[in-house]
Swiss-Prot record:
Enzyme class: transferase
Cofactor(s) needed: [4Fe-4S] cluster
Name of the protein: Lipoyl synthase
Residues annotated for [4Fe-4S] cluster 1 binding in this entry: 72, 77, 83, 312
Pathways per UniProt: Protein modification; protein lipoylation via endogenous pathway; protein N(6)-(lipoyl)lysine from octanoyl-[acyl-carrier-protein]: step 2/2
UniProt keyword annotation of rRNA-binding present: no
Keywords: 4Fe-4S, Cytoplasm, Iron, Iron-sulfur, Metal-binding, S-adenosyl-L-methionine, Transferase
The organism's taxonomic lineage, starting at the top: Bacteria, Pseudomonadati, Pseudomonadota, Gammaproteobacteria, Pseudomonadales
Subcellular location: Cytoplasm
Sequence ranges assigned to domain Radical SAM core in this UniProt record: 84-301
Broad class of the protein's primary localization: cytoplasm
GO molecular function terms attached to this record: 4 iron, 4 sulfur cluster binding; lipoate synthase activity; metal ion binding
Domain of life: Bacteria
Annotated residues for binding of [4Fe-4S] cluster 2: 98, 102, 105
Length: 325
């Protein structure tokens, strides 16, 4: 089994553009991840369809043609096959190298390259080529940028809307640590149709799961966006299986509602590799269903809760439900 210990010796400085994954990625976080002997056996209710189809290949080719990244691939999402096969994708902008080292995440860490000024237009053209109706735009954390990448988000949305005027756009943003006000001011100039930022886990587990992030900061980000753009639904999500209790999940859901968050996603954490945080429990589908019921009682406009639910899974259906309830 895996365990968590105090971090030890730090490795050499990483060159810009070099992507660290696995053990190298988590080497400098406040806690040390001891690799598991093997990945845990998944229960019967977790079954993922192998992502092989003409639609999957076509979308991958389009991404490569326009030099784009999908979080579906970078984060090893279990729904990649279903979403790609239905002709939808979540795009990851600002490169594929993150400035954070979250040990649950499979996206690479390092010193990112400079932003690609052509990315907004390339992204817009790719989305137009694929004739998508609902798109989620997310990004790596870019702590190296003065605005955390908020202007690049706005530029992407603006270019996409030029070529696809009827499209619905959801943004899944980082926490804009240390630059919330400037980031939100920029975001308000070109707001998305849904503003999403994931809390990921309960406050007690932040040090081990989200080093460099702060639970209260993330809640405030969602609330302050809603204050600036009250007509846009806000959304957040949690991964279950990192060591949280059911009671802690309910408490976080209540805090979300106190901060006027409209939509909720709850999914099972799946350990990407032996060098990531270990799965502490596999939450039964009945428990996910119970969380969904409790969430609706609390006043969420839409709750997507299930073992394979991810932040952008069926995001179009969730947004439609939130706007018509």
């Amino acid at each position: 089994m895996s365990s968590v210990e105090t971090a030890g010796k730090r490795p050499a400085k990483v060159e810009a553009g070099v992507k660290l994954r696995g053990a190298e990625k988590v080497a400098r976080i406040p806690v040390k991840i001891i690799p598991t002997d093997e990945l845990p056996k998944k229960p019967d209710w977790i079954r993922v369809r192998i992502p092989v189809s003409p639609e999957v290949d076509q979308i991958k080719q389009t991404l490569r043609k326009h030099k784009l990244h999908s979080v579906c691939e970078e984060a090893s999402c279990p729904n990649l096959g279903e979403c790609f096969s239905s002709g939808t994708a979540t795009f990851m902008i600002m490169g594929d190298i993150c400035t954070r080292r979250c040990p649950f995440c499979d996206v690479g860490h390092g010193r990112p390259n400079a932003l690609d000024p052509d990315e907004p237009k390339n992204l817009a053209q790719a989305i137009a080529d694929m004739r998508l109706k609902y798109v989620v735009i997310t990004s790596v954390d870019r702590d190296d940028l003065r605005d955390g990448g908020a202007q690049h988000f706005a530029d992407c949305l603006r270019e996409i809307r030029k070529l696809s005027p009827s499209i619905q756009l959801e943004t899944l943003v980082p926490d804009y640590r240390g630059r919330m006000e400037i980031a939100l001011d920029i975001t308000a100039t070109e707001p998305p149709d849904v503003f999403n930022h994931n809390l990921e886990t309960v406050p007690r587990l932040y040090k081990s799961s989200r080093p460099g992030s702060d639970f209260e900061w993330s809640l405030d980000l969602l609330e302050k966006f809603k204050q600036r753009v009250p007509g846009v639904p806000t959304k957040s999500g949690l991964m279950l299986g990192l060591g949280e209790t059911d009671e802690e999940v309910i408490e976080v859901m209540q805090r979300m509602r106190e901060h006027d968050i409209d939509m909720l996603t709850l999914g099972q954490y799946l350990q990407p590799s032996r060098n990531h945080l270990p799965v502490q429990r596999f939450v039964h589908p009945d428990t996910f269903a119970w969380f969904a019921e409790e969430g609706m009682k609390m006043g969420f406009k839409n709750v997507a809760s299930g073992p394979l639910v991810r932040s952008s899974y069926h995001a179009d259906q969730q947004a439609h439900g939130a706007k018509h309830d």
